[in-house]
Amino acid sequence: MNNREITSLWSRLIVEELIRQGCGFFCLSPGSRSTPLTVAVARNPMAKWKTFPDERSAGFFALGHARATGKPAILICTSGTAVANYFPSVVEASMDCQPMIILSADRPFELLETGANQTIRQSGMFGSYSRWNFRLPEPSAEIPLQSVLSAIDHAVEKATGNPPGPVHLNVPFREPFEPELSDLKDPWLAPVAHWIDSAEPLRRCSHAENVPHPAVIEKTAELIKASRQPLFIAGKLDSREDAIAVGLLAGSLGIPLYADLSSGLRYSTHCKPWQLAFQSPAFLEHYRPDMVVHFGGQLISRHPGAAIRVSHPGNYLVVKPSANRYAPDHNVTLSIEASPKLFADALLRDLQNVSLPAWKGPVADEFFTFSEEEIEHYCEDDRPVSEISVARIVSRLTGEHDGLFMSNSMPVRDMDLFAAATRQTPTISIAMNRGASGIDGILSTAAGFAEGLQKPVTLVIGDIAFLHDLNALSLLESSSVPLRIIVVNNNGGGIFSFLPIAAEKDVFETHFATPQHYSIASAAATFGVAHASPKTNREFADTCTEAFESNESIVIEITGSREDNVSAHRSLQHTINMLARKFLKKQ
């Protein structure tokens, strides 16, 4: 067997084993050194793939695909700086526990650190952000093929383990790269003959859910029974099953549940919009939780954390599926590594016949009702569409089984705060890049999320984040499902207008707000994507309704000013705080 045959077979086995492990979607970036892997993907009838000229975009697309499927998409690139372009998406995947597998082609050993062209130190380049990094040997008939298959199996195991995350396999190749069919009866293949004849991977892996210890359930139940004002928090939850279980627990016990947008429960009619209350100083003067059970990961808003710092609850429990640390204020008293669903189910069984102290539910309900009526004023048909009404209207119009992706900065905060709760159960697939909370790669991630879901996805994004990932619009032409992109164009970084630096007029506009004067419509036209620019809430709702019924991607641009947005937010918040004072007098 010659070198071309060995290299071709080596690559075919790697790709085939990944597919047998259920990792059959490949994000390919063109390059010479990665030719054997690319050809192996292209010629495998079971492989699904998409080609990306930009590795940075590919990395975020793979991230979005994993968010939708729970399985790692496979990234393949050539040697050199190509693999470094994955770094931002690797950080996000690592921080937010999303599976990812990178196969980076590399120069062989004899060319490393010699000044050879397009040769860098690739092995271990992602440092602590990878769950496992490993350099495969150069293809050789001296290497047992079982060891190659076993390495691939372990890569999948680490990428999908607890916690999931990125895995980096460095795959060196010597020239020539051009494919050549090999003789499958060669003695080198004899030890894996059974594998060749089957459709199974060499080794499967299994990950069990963390079952809560009965003693921990009992302790938690006792703490809740002894509490005067308990609070449940649902942070980022990884599954619909987790969300349903946590929502059922809170509803059955009558304990307030702060449901973050990332929990999947924010749209549930069973959950009150506690975001409105926790932004009200007047409300927090009267509601001071003395015991908190926090399910899942981090929150979008800083206000619950600030309120808890003030109330100093004697017990703050965090229930999360892995041992990753969550204690940004260093006030967690018990960290519980367990499945949120299994923990919530067990806790409900323990407490279902227990009478708990009543809290002022009717007063709070009245406050929430009137507060949401104030938000609805901003959504009146003939009013100009605003960042507040965008969140409210999109939350109402998103289809029952569609996807929603929220960009960082203001869009995700507005949706968390102003969304309308219109669903009995959490059916909308909601995603966001909140691991490291950057604005980079948002369009690419949303496109990957839609591809993974195989459902239409609505993306709400600011103008700066849109421009940051503009080349991702090229992905939509070959997409199998539409992406509806709502661009909130306030001519710059709107979130900075809410920060104290906005008062420093001599530096704010040029160094922080960074106004841009590019045409969003022209950008969309360049990539052949439809564009609309509604001016009123009625026009926006009609445009969204039409877009949501179409199978075509579209950019819907909402223009406004940062100054008007800050004024509207502060005015609405003042009104809500006044409502809190009014209704709290009834207690």
Swiss-Prot record:
Keywords: Magnesium, Manganese, Menaquinone biosynthesis, Metal-binding, Thiamine pyrophosphate, Transferase. Pathway: Quinol/quinone metabolism; 1,4-dihydroxy-2-naphthoate biosynthesis; 1,4-dihydroxy-2-naphthoate from chorismate: step 2/7; Quinol/quinone metabolism; menaquinone biosynthesis. It comes from Chlorobium phaeobacteroides (strain DSM 266 / SMG 266 / 2430). One of its GO terms (molecular function) is 2-succinyl-5-enolpyruvyl-6-hydroxy-3-cyclohexene-1-carboxylic-acid synthase activity. It catalyses: isochorismate + 2-oxoglutarate + H(+) = 5-enolpyruvoyl-6-hydroxy-2-succinyl-cyclohex-3-ene-1-carboxylate + CO2. It is an enzyme of class 2 (transferase). This is 2-succinyl-5-enolpyruvyl-6-hydroxy-3-cyclohexene-1-carboxylate synthase. Homodimer. Binds 1 thiamine pyrophosphate per subunit. It holds the Pfam family TPP_enzyme_C.
